[in-house]
Amino acid sequence: MKVRPSVKKMCPKCKVIRRRGILRVICDNPRHKQRQG
């Protein structure tokens, strides 16, 4: 899980979702998981 100021899709399978006001990226590739912090 990467925590960064701006989250971006890193590949076509990445999805940007909003959970409880936190932007997250979920993907099949665990390296692509991100959270906005």
From Swiss-Prot:
GO annotation terms (biological process): translation
Entry keyword Ribosomal protein: yes
Pfam families: Ribosomal_L36
MF annotations from Gene Ontology: structural constituent of ribosome
Taxonomy, superkingdom: Bacteria
Assigned keywords, A-Z: Ribonucleoprotein, Ribosomal protein
Ribonucleoprotein is among the record's keywords: yes
Matching InterPro entries: Ribosomal_bL36, Ribosomal_bL36_sp
GO cellular component entries: cytoplasm; ribonucleoprotein complex; ribosome
HAMAP family listed in its UniProt record: Ribosomal_bL36
UniProt similarity note: Belongs to the bacterial ribosomal protein bL36 family.
The protein, known as: Large ribosomal subunit protein bL36
Source organism phylogeny: Bacteria, Pseudomonadati, Thermodesulfobacteriota, Desulfovibrionia, Desulfovibrionales
